[in-house]
From Swiss-Prot:
One GO cellular component, as annotated: extracellular region
Mod. after translation: The activation peptide is released by thrombin.
Name of this protein: Coagulation factor XIII A chain
Subunit structure: Tetramer of two A chains (F13A1) and two B (F13B) chains.
Gene expressing this chain: F13A1
Taxonomic path: Eukaryota, Metazoa, Chordata, Craniata, Vertebrata
Organism of this sequence: Homo sapiens (Human)
Proregion span(s): 2-38
Length: 732
């Protein structure tokens, strides 16, 4: 095999990096061995006239390989599984004197030992785990082959050639884009590293192109649908382009560990011009607010066409795009949400909340933040680089939080290893362990410089970890896959193991932790609706025979969902007298006018209550967050819901606020029903309703979902969705 271009290697034989699927080197159509005698016509030997790949959606190849949903007219197969190719020759094939083989090539500088040049021999029987081609039909001038790929081969877009051997050299077909073949990971193949043995799980984690993302607050969980769109036109090529932009060597693209790690770095643009720019400051000039996106398709296609990072994303957007990337390539993946997620820069398993001596929060000393929720991904794969038992779900996170080996990425970290405290195993397990296992420490910073630990809350962080249930839109609690229940012996052993294997010990604090107080405090927040007043109820319970007086402080803040406060909108001090063995409730009215002018896009409020028992100097502290209920978009359809037939979709929104909404963008998406689209309204006045109608022509049958979002200068995170059942086109 010869190269079409020669490269100067500076006195050292080396092959340049092969890190672009899009780059090509053509193989020569003729490779002669010696001099061809005069009068010999090479065209008299067996010649290929055409190649058929059976690549239509309804053909066996795509149906058997579960790739019939891809909007791509090329052949798409999954590795480790046989597929059919038919070759037409210039004359009938005679196995006694004719010799040919199929060749697959990817990238430039193809090498057999790197897996970038694959000669596929004709064999009598296919062998599991090996490339091979078996003749399953000979008819006239045609030969049909059953070709089996290796379950470890590179994932990407291959160029296909047919080579015929003659006494004088090799005759090879010309480069033909129509025979290009995509090879993907195969969760249906037992020998593939991403093999998943449950069909319902494969349908959910590989083939489902619509998901549900959980957000909000642990006591007020909210949901939104997300269009992954992994089968949409152009998405597969974009996912390969993402790896090209990372300059990932092609020889590593068959390893799901490497692919998922590269993906976690490339979905964010922090240090590598990746897909999405993150922004958490509520300012989204020259971009789209994170809450406005309805799915991954627009984001990925814009990244591919502009070749520049797309603005803007936050954790659930990064997770949604990353899920598309993984599922598109064939790696089973899901989005998980961790409620009360610790962002622990030191991974020391401790989140410190510093208090003044009077009980107020010391914002200068308090640096750690607890996110109301954080979304990341899990990808399913074996981990041959780890001891037995640590395969399966791996945590991977593309939200740029911490630097890992010089880049902003996280994982894959074995969820099983995290649960048992084996944080020594790569990649980034200590960080994920801290996200779900840190303690919340309340510390009084005394004026003399000493610190006193007032309270330790070991159950606040990682309160609930959830994902979408299989086959439905409900919530599945997976907390016990990450951690043992608090207080169990296994939980203590996991923590000791994590400390032994490298997690940092909690910082030492001066003084001795105080004994449990005789007074308990808790508070509840009423269901809070955007633009309405609501109440907060604080309950004090005296468990002793003593009489106590209490001075309590309430701090109400507008916060980012990451737990970082933007502004304090209410501060209140009150005194409470508790008789022996009694309880008392204090109600605080939160008025809409106090918070409306400063709200951030997720309408998240955080309440911090501290109380000092004057007689004992004990400090009680509790904090809770709430997400205001935001009005929804209404979606309606009329007309026949049939593949290929027009149906009208109406998007409707009524402004319930007392102020005019300006610069309103409405987004509509629905994989298989409509391409992503958007419409702008200059303003929506109070109590006014706007409507937007579009005619759609579905191209995918079955259960589908329409998803809409609305964003404006002063109101965001407005969603709506509608389930539709698209019928097949009636046969004639």
């Amino acid at each position: 095999m010869s190269e079409t271009s020669r490269t100067a290697f500076g006195g050292r034989r080396a092959v340049p990096p092969n890190n672009s699927n899009a780059a090509e080197d053509d193989l020569p159509t003729v490779e002669l061995q010696g001099v061809v005698p005069r009068g010999v016509n090479l065209q008299e030997f067996l010649n290929v006239t055409s190649v058929h790949l059976f690549k239509e959606r309804w053909d066996t190849n795509k149906v058997d390989h579960h790739t019939d949903k891809y909007e791509n007219n090329k052949l798409i197969v999954r590795r480790g599984q046989s597929f059919y190719v038919q070759i037409d020759f210039s004359r009938p094939y005679d196995p006694r004197r004719d010799l040919f083989r199929v060749e697959y090539v990817i990238g430039r500088y193809p090498q057999e030992n790197k897996g970038t040049y694959i000669p596929v021999p004709i064999v009598s029987e296919l062998q599991s785990g090996k490339w091979g081609a078996k003749i399953v039909m000979r008819e006239d001038r045609s030969v049909r082959l059953s070709i089996q790929s290796s379950p470890k081969c590179i994932v990407g877009k291959f160029r296909m050639y047919v080579a015929v051997w003659t006494p004088y050299g090799v005759l090879r077909t010309s480069r033909n884009p129509e025979t290009d073949t995509y090879i993907l990971f195969n969760p249906w193949c037992e020998d593939d590293a991403v093999y998943l043995d449950n069909e319902k799980e494969r349908e959910e984690y590989v083939l489902n192109d619509i998901g549900v993302i959980f957000y909000g607050e642990v006591n007020d969980i909210k949901t939104r649908s997300w269009s992954y769109g992994q089968f949409e036109d152009g998405i597969l090529d974009t996912c390969l382009y993402v790896m090209d932009r990372a300059q990932m060597d092609l020889s590593g693209r068959g390893n799901p560990i490497k692919v998922s790690r590269v993906g976690s770095a490339m979905v964010n643009a922090k240090d590598d011009e990746g897909v999405l720019v993150g922004s958490w400051d509520n300012i989204y000039a020259y971009g789209v607010p994170p809450s406005a996106w309805t799915g991954s398709v627009d984001i990925l296609l814009e990244y591919r066409s502009s070749e520049n990072p797309v603005r803007y994303g936050q954790c659930w957007v990064f997770a949604g795009v990353f899920n598309t990337f993984l599922r598109c390539l064939g790696i089973p993946a899901r989005i998980v949400t961790n409620y009360f997620s610790a962002h622990d820069n030191d991974a020391n398993l401790q989140m410190d909340i510093f208090l003044e001596e009077d009980g107020n929060v010391n914002s200068k000393l308090t640096k750690d933040s607890v996110w109301n929720y954080h979304c990341w991904n899990e990808a399913w794969m074996t981990r041959p680089d780890l001891p037995v038992g640590f395969g399966g779900w791996q945590a991977v996170d593309s939200t740029p939080q911490e630097n890992s080996d010089g880049m902003y990425r996280c994982g894959p970290a074995s969820v099983q290893a995290i649960k048992h405290g084996h944080v020594c195993f790569q990649f980034d397990a200590p960080f994920v362990f801290a996200e779900v296992n840190s303690d919340l420490i309340y510390i009084t910073a005394k004026k003399d410089g000493t610190h006193v630990v007032e309270n330790v809350d070991a159950t606040h962080i990682g309160k609930l970890i959830v994902t979408k249930q299989i086959g439905g839109d409900g919530m599945m609690d997976i907390t016990d896959t990450y951690k043992f229940q608090e207080g169990q012996e296994e939980e203590r052993l996991a923590l000791e193991t994590a400390l032994m294997y490298g997690a940092k010990k909690p910082l030492n604090t001066e003084g001795v932790m105080k004994s449990r107080s005789n007074v308990d405090m808790d508070f509840e927040v009423e269901n809070a609706v955007l633009g309405k007043d609501f109440k907060l109820s604080i309950t004090f319970r005296n468990n002793s025979h003593n009489r106590y007086t209490i001075t309590a402080y309430l701090s109400a803040n507008i916060t980012f969902y990451t737990g970082v406060p933007k502004a304090e909108f209410k501060k209140e001090t009150f005194d409470v007298t508790l008789e022996p063995l009694s309880f008392k409730k204090e109600a605080v009215l939160i008025q809409a006018g106090e918070y409306m002018g400063q709200l951030l896009e997720q309408a998240s409020l955080h309440f911090f209550v501290t109380a000092r028992i004057n007689e004992t100097r004990d400090v009680l502290a509790k904090q809770k967050s709430t997400v205001l209920t935001i009005p929804e978009i209404i979606i309606k359809v009329r007309g026949t819901q049939v593949v290929g037939s027009d149906m009208t979709v109406t998007v409707e929104f009524t402004n319930p606020l007392k102020e005019t909404l300006r610069n309103v963008w409405v987004h509509l998406d629905g994989p298989g029903v409509t391409r992503p689209m958007k419409k702008m309204f200059r303003e929506i006045r109070p109590n006014s309703t706007v409507q937007w109608e579009e005619v759609c022509r579905p191209w995918v049958s079955g259960h589908r979902k329409l998803i809409a979002s609305m964003s404006s200068d002063s109101l965001r995170h407005v969603y709506g969705e509608l389930d539709v059942q698209i019928q097949r086109r009636p046969s004639m």
